[in-house]
């Protein structure tokens, strides 16, 4: 056998290499197809365009999908190609493939058989692709006869031979694997025959049929090999095949081998769908090493054979996953039966072997369904439905296998942890590919492949919760292949919720692989309809997750019961026994519900996502569905459509009720997805993945830890269900609110199990906040934001719990989710505003906080500060002084101007400068905060700056910048309102309000920045706006009403003082230019004087004229002009710099001339309304040409209010 195994391993390696190349090529082709679907993938993101975080995620996810493709190119490509070759159809048409390959009448059974056959065809796809269709349908239909006829003898022979042969070789392993599976089924007695034909349909007989199909379909050998291994071992452990002791021994040997092989297999479990492809592609050497270890054992051959042929199993895996779920459902009922001493014996002896084998089988994905079919589950479930009975059988065998697998995987987890390193690579790849944070959570518990296998199990386990690990992995693969059909059958599944439970596990795997990311995001809402039924399995599964930390096999039991984790097999039987009620009932629909399962997969992907093995299979499936990943947006829609089919279930309602939120969640999921790859690669990564999956994983994990800690499987299931299926609905909503949930989940979840993931979640939120508020001062705003989000997160979390508690609460949750979506949108808007103004607002709040201290010192500083403001405006020094004193109070009596500004900048600048930079635009929104900050009361503390007391106002720099943005926003709002008005007078009034806001913005800008350029531009634009206002109507005409004349005075005074402010901004430059120009003209005048004597016409005027020029720059300019005109100056060239300087100088000085001119015009109009302005000056202050802009705004606003009152009164 060892020699054969080595020979066959070589053959398998060759086949693997060939298939790898073929799959890589096909994968590349499919990848090319993926880009075509990329737009679909982008669509979901488009829904969340407004969300900065979502857009980042979109970018990340898009890149990640590509990376994921590359990472899983080998596995994915192989799987995709294998699946395509096997089914001769695209991965996505898995359901169509099933339908096309298998008659619709026997579609479910065909799916099982085909999936079983397809595994073989997958490997055969290399050389037996043509055989696959033939085998699939013939076996699907002939299976019954084959089953009945050859179930006992041929199957037993095949089993024995295959078991031994698998030890011996891999190519023969196909046939032997099938036979072995049949043999195992034979041990199950004629179950294999019935199961082949009725594997989905007939519960008790159907356990063997999957193996029979495997047997008949030698193409399915990869699965059959893995499945046979598990079957043999599980039969032995479960006592199903006492006569199969040789096979069992072979299985045991294979199991023994499998632990080592599981080194390969664990690598395979991560990419369960096509673990062999990923293993060959990733670790052919690894597989060979395990081969060296396992060669003596049958498992080695299986592992290599499975690996090569597993590649083609993507669809088979999905299809078989379909079977698996059926198997798993009965597994619950049968688990008790299957929990036999043989299991304990086999567990002890072949726990590791079984774990490896089951892992490999899961990887192969063809075995678990047959194994599931073989075992007692048929008895457990047959009563429920004829089809469910098959499913029950499958589930029961799966459960048996799972129990064995659990025990073996528990033991094997230890042994496999050694393999863990190799598996970890695959797992990381598959995890990253899967980008399933839940998978990642399980992954940390079982970093090694065996955990991944159990992890893969949880998906089906979540569905079946008692399915064997291999069954689960198979169900994962089946779900991968059948998830699409499942999503359609999910509708029927919802109709037959009790039946669907078993099928659900399968879809989770598919979803895990791709749909998990896609459907989980979108389809999960659809899945929630099943949520109530699948809720229990997910809830238990969370607990199983928790136990998976201790033992991967426990995950299986966990799926059934968190407390039974230790005795995963026994506990599983009870939980699964209930689930058979649910899932086995659903099983018959599963047969009818290939689409439904997909939906189920959508729901459960969260849970399965945790399984690393499932992650691996997902990687493979994702390889197949990678195109789907890209078109995930479409897939989300499709899945949504499927859920719509499922509309019967609440998830549909949730999806339809909150369709838009569901899309953002999908983007968020993509977000999670993108972040998941890295997390899945590292344990710390899983936490990030959780963060990414925040909604999914945090709920999932938080719920899982809770359920684990709580121990009650249902409590865990409830939280898990909310995280998984109801969480699908919730996640539909919660994903909408994913951002808030991460924080909430972080708080809730971090304490439970994934404290780091919450931190990661916090980090993510922090990243958003960081981008907006990077500095510590921003932390307050971040905390506030986090708090804002977290309370909703708490609500969301609680709502999710409620949804898990009762599906009836799903509607509430959806409403809550919708509200949360609104809240999330609000939060996002708030984040944007906060990013702009929260930094400012945080600074405002901080300043407000500091202001309390300021007032105390304000009294003293008011006394101290009044002088500085007086300099700017003696009339209103007190107000500026108060404002300054407040800010200076912060400075603690330091230099009011610089020290206050420096202290404030120290206080807030650390965060505010960046905030301002980031929030330059947002600072306008901070004007809203301005009122809250308390600056509004003294909105013009900086105005003194224009008066020349700019430094005293500088302490307000942070406030000012934030205020500047707020004022700018307010000004633009007013301006837009004014533009919409038709009445010219009303429009002019509204424009004046905008002018005042613009002036305030300029004041804040001037006080905030050292440079006066920005303030100067604001003032300049404001002056232009005032000119436009004055052009709307001749307000200053003699015939104009008194109110309009008053309005004209206010406008002209604003314009005049603004011109003075503009001059002050450029005063230093004007003085500098004046000196330079004077020097230049003096030198030029001297040069002109020399030739001037020769020119009589010139006379002394031209030479003398330059002399007075120093006195007045204008005179110097004129004299220069005269010199030029004299003709002597014609020879003198004026430097360009001088020309520019002169032009700038004239422009700057013209502001003063304009200001005086306008002021005189305003004074003339003021005389006609002395009473009004006298009262205004008394109430506010006397406005002068050198008044500060703060005084101007205060004065103008007060006068404008009085003017409006006068306008209303008449």
From Swiss-Prot:
The keyword Transmembrane appears for this protein: no
Composition skew (Pro residues), residue ranges: 267-279, 442-453
InterPro entries: AF4/FMR2 (IPR007797), AF4/FMR2_CHD (IPR043640), AF4_int (IPR043639)
Subcellular location, record wording: Nucleus
Keyword Phosphoprotein: yes
Recorded GO CC terms: super elongation complex; transcription elongation factor complex
Residues found modified as N6-acetyllysine: 681
Ranges annotated as biased composition (Acidic residues): 423-439, 473-497
Biased composition (Polar residues): 215-238, 394-419, 586-602, 707-724
Compositional bias segments (type: Low complexity): 454-472, 871-880, 1110-1119
Residue numbers of Phosphothreonine PTMs: 220, 697, 755
Biased composition (Basic and acidic residues): 9-35, 78-87, 245-259, 536-546, 688-699, 732-747, 816-834, 906-932
Keywords for the protein's UniProt record, in alphabetical order: Acetylation, Chromosomal rearrangement, Nucleus, Phosphoprotein, Proto-oncogene
Pfam families (alphabetical): AF-4, AF4_int, AFF4_CHD
GO biological process terms held by the UniProt record: regulation of gene expression
Record-listed Phosphoserine modification sites: 199, 206, 212, 588, 750
Region Disordered: start-end pairs: 1-45, 73-314, 366-957, 1098-1119
Chief location of this protein within or outside the cell: nucleus
Family statement drawn from the similarity comment of this UniProt entry: Belongs to the AF4 family.
Self-association state and partner proteins as the record states: Component of the super elongation complex (SEC), at least composed of EAF1, EAF2, CDK9, MLLT3/AF9, AFF (AFF1 or AFF4), the P-TEFb complex and ELL (ELL, ELL2 or ELL3).
Annotated disease: A chromosomal aberration involving AFF1 is associated with acute leukemias. Translocation t(4;11)(q21;q23) with KMT2A/MLL1. The result is a rogue activator protein.
Protein name: AF4/FMR2 family member 1
